[in-house]
Amino acid sequence: MDTPFAKTPSNLLIAGVDEAGRGPLAGPVITAAVILNPEIIIEGLADSKKLSLKKREELYEKIITNCKAFAIARADVEEIDRLNIFRATLLAMQRAINQLSIQPDKVLIDGHCCPDLPYETQAIVQGDQNVPAISAASILAKVTRDREMLKYDAQYPDYGFAIHKGYGTKAHLAAIHRFGITPVHRKSFEPVRQLKLFIPEE
């Protein structure tokens, strides 16, 4: 079956872009941009959400070792609260693409919307499942964000960030109600926005 990206010339430098962390109640949104090396096939690339932790870590190392270029960027909690998650995500995508050591000929982005870029850009729904460069970007973003949440777990051990990665699970919501919110919680998100208790920054 023909896809919108099937006819992209093979000699073009294609950057795949994806994010991790749009939905959680805490932590940054992380984005990654990857230009794969067409001469080195990385087996097993897929949507990061469908891969095991071990497989993601393995592929992370293969991607950063064998790709032509990659960059990882972020929008912090403060930017998410100030801009909203949609705009903050687009900003983080811009940052990742601008940080690439090689300028791409075309940028393929997972989802429906594209940031403003000086390159030919295309949004592809389910691109993380169908476009290897986007799959690679999704893996880099997911692994990077999960590692970040482990650091938060050590800093705020009562919240279980290592387990739920900031998503609004029952355990996470219970911890928020019991202990209040931390500086890494998104104050513009429900139900965080409804709470008045804050844990002061140290």
UniProtKB/Swiss-Prot annotation:
Where, in this chain's numbering, is a divalent metal cation bound? 18-19, 110
CC cofactor note? Manganese or magnesium. Binds 1 divalent metal ion per monomer in the absence of substrate. May bind a second metal ion after substrate binding.
The reaction(s) catalysed by this protein are: Endonucleolytic cleavage to 5'-phosphomonoester
Q: Which GO terms describe its biological process?
A: DNA replication, removal of RNA primer; mismatch repair
A cellular component annotation (GO) from this entry: cytoplasm
So which cofactors does this thing need? Answer: Mn(2+); Mg(2+)
RNase H type-2 domain: which residues? Answer: 12-201
Q: Tell where it localizes.
A: Cytoplasm
**Chief location of this protein within or outside the cell:** cytoplasm
Any single GO molecular-function term of the entry would be: RNA-DNA hybrid ribonuclease activity
The alphabetical list of record keywords is: Cytoplasm, Endonuclease, Hydrolase, Manganese, Metal-binding, Nuclease
Q: What class of enzyme is it?
A: hydrolase
Entry-linked SUPFAM superfamilies: Ribonuclease H-like
Q: What is its EC number?
A: 3.1.26.4
Q: So what does this one do?
A: Endonuclease that specifically degrades the RNA of RNA-DNA hybrids.
Q: Which family does it belong to?
A: Belongs to the RNase HII family.
HAMAP family reported for this sequence = RNase_HII_B (MF_00052_B)
Could you tell me what this protein is called? Answer: Ribonuclease HII
Q: Which gene encodes it?
A: rnhB
